[in-house]
Structures are given as structure tokens and as C-alpha cells.
Amino acid sequence: MDTIKSEELECFRKDKWLVLDTRTKEEYNSGNINADYNFDYYSPTFAEKLSELSKEKNYIVYCKSGGRSSKAMSLMKELGFKNVKNLEGGITTWIEKGFPITK
């Protein structure tokens, strides 16, 4: 399964999964899910920034609703990342379910 639900995120974090926000810096600064990284999917340096990450670690990617992050997940898998999952519904669903954000 390549997606996880909002309710599952904390369990994955406890197992040392890292969180990558693929939204713009402005979106990130307006509130995020305590992300470990913020790499704008639309940035021309997105793939270059991904190459700086360890392909052996586990990552959960998210965006506003899941579109950008699903594309980012596909790219990461193409680049050889072993474990990548997409947060279903992105930060929009996260907020709708009442989970906290960091500003």
C-alpha cells in the first residue's frame, strides 16, 4: 500500500519515518505537519534536493490534497528510494480530522 491515512501518521513517525512536505515555502510557512523537510515539488531543484536524502530511510510525503505528493512519491521510487508513502488527502484531510499543525 502506497498511501497512509492521517490516523496512521504518528505510528509511522514512531518507527522513524521522515515527513517531506512538497508544497511551496509559503504554503509550508502557513502551517505544516511537523515536517522534517520542505522541498517544493514545482521547484526546478526538486529532484536535486531529493538526491541529498538517504535512499535507505523511510519517507512519508504530503502536499495540500495529494496530487503533488503522489507525483513526488513516484519520482522518489524512480530515483531508488526504497520506502515512500503518500499521506492520503494531504494536509487538507489532516486538518479536517482535527490533527495539529505547526506554524
For each of these PLM feature ranges, what is it?
Residues 1-18, 25-58, 64-103:
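Rhodanese-like catalytic fold shared by cysteine-dependent sulfurtransferases
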